[in-house]
């Protein structure tokens, strides 16, 4: 598990939020499970494109960047299972070989899929909901 330097400060993209927490980046499910078992307070962090203090903590910030890509897909249902740390800018490229695509996407594509889902990222169009509305399950 990668652990960021203790003196490193995490900041959101606008610089309006910051945190001096220990940032951890597990690469295996077992590391993630161990982290959850041994820490009472964990905040997930991605690209930091939220203005709200969602990631503000003095304890542990969890970065899921190593959990990326498509795990499984169902061509008939045009559904796929995607890992939480997948960045939106990679998701389109990942979906192309399986003839799938996002029906709608926000202007900014730096977010992780988990971040886009949890912060209400949306695209344009009166009839198109935010990305979270397309989630079938976790």
What does each of the following model-derived ranges do?
Residues 14-110, 117-125:
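Glycine-rich N-terminal segment of FAD-binding domains in flavoprotein oxidoreductases
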